[in-house]
Amino acid sequence: GEVVFNTAMMGYPESLTDPSYAGQLMTLTYPLVGNYGVPPFTVEKNGIATFMESDKIYASAIIVADYSEQYCHWNAVESLADWLKREHVPGITGIDTRELTKVLREHGLMMSQTMYRKLFTKVSISLTRSAVRR
């Protein structure tokens, strides 16, 4: 899928559940991800989700520099890794996400291929230029 990036310091539950990221590999540039876990999926009386954009993860994968297995937040109900595993979404760590973001900014749209053995294992990403012309 297409590799995209997000420069927000927090809000990965909202970003991952945003339908606009459907099928894309989301690169998070903030250096530490997962340290506040994942909040519960709740809906307000008006029908709007409280901590997420929808009830499922739309991104096809998440790419982070450093994943924190330890999480601590008053509202967290599970770790990011547990949530991704439950939703069958691969997580990739050990990538220089800021350098990857520079490449994406300089070269534009890029497609990727991921190969992994288990959730949050250091792997290689093979980036190729998209056949789509601007």
Residue ranges and their predicted role:
Residues 1-134:
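RNA-binding accessory domains that recognize and position tRNA/RNA substrates
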